[in-house]
Amino acid sequence: HVLLVGAGAERFARIMGCEEGDLETELSKKVYQAFIDDAFDDEGVIDESQNWVVKYARSQNLREWFDKLADEHHGTVNIMALDANGDIASAVSTSGTALKFPGRLGDSPIIGAGNYCDNRYGAAACTGRGELAIRNSTARTIIHYLENGLNPEEAAFLAMKDIHDLNGVGGMNCIVLDNKGNTISATTTPERDSVYWYFDVDMTEAEQRAGINVQK
C-alpha cells in the first residue's frame, strides 16, 4: 500500500499504536471563533502572529463562503530520519489550512508533493500552501535535484525558486536530508526565519539550526 485515507488510515494508526490527540489549540480556537463571530477587528482578539489568517480570509472572501456553507465544523510537522543501515524515512502530519473548503486535500498526504524519500539520495518534506507543492511536486523535485548532484542547500534553494515562479498565493517551506546526513531548511516567506531541529546519535538533545530564506 502507498496511501491510506479515512477510516482505514485511522484503523492502521491504532494498530500501530499511534497516540490520538486533539489538534486544536486555545489559540486556533480563539482565531476560529473570531472568524465565526466576524470579530477580527475587535481589540485583543487577534494577535500579530495570526495576522496571516485575517489577510487570507479577507483576500479569499472566506466570509461569503462560510455564510453559504454554514458548516461548523493548525500547523504541519515534518520528520525525516536516516538510520545506520542507510534507510531513510519521511513523515508529515497536518491539520490542513485554516478555513478550508470541505473536502480540500493538501500536499501532506501526496507522496512527491508534501514528502518524498529515496535511500539513494535523501528525503524532503514541505509545509505551507499545499496547492503550490502539489503543482510543482516539490518534495520529489528536491530529490531530483539531489540525484543530479546538488547539495541539500542548493536543492532547497532551487525548489523554493520554483515555487516563486508559480506566482501563486501563499508561501512554502521545506526541509531536506541527503543520504550522507546533511540537512537544511528553506522558506519563501520574506518575514520568516527558516529553522529546523536536528538530532543524531552523538547528541544528548536536539539543536535548532538555521535554514535559508529564498526570495525572487
Identify the residue ranges that each predicted region occupies:
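N-terminal nucleophile
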Residues: 1-216
